[in-house]
Amino acid sequence: MLPVYAYLLHLLSGCVLIAVFFAIYTWITPFDEIALIREGNMAAALSLAGAVVGFCLTLASSILHSDGYEMFLLWSVGAMVVQSGGYAAITRMLPQMNGAIEHNNAAMGALMGTASLALGIINAACLS
């Protein structure tokens, strides 16, 4: 495959995978992040941003270190599972997290976003 085609394949696939992750992540949370963000809810924005960036770090590492396109897709699905599992674990450890985000507790949103970002960094490093 010509390098430009490989580039376009990974770029377009990455964009689609980000959209899929975004849809899944916002579906599993019990509140509507987009509506909250439109209302100016900083906690929801921080939480969602951390999850998306954490996922993107794993996508980038997968593109860099995978032997082929199929492995890139496999690791991407794995990253979705890890990020979603991280959300589930944090909200189980901190049951007030969801309510705090809905009520625009920016500190809790930052904590959730930072935890998601940290998980994404570790997950990305595991692929190298």
Tell what function each PLM region has.
Residues L36-A49:
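Loop-to-helix transition at the N-terminal end of transmembrane alpha-helices
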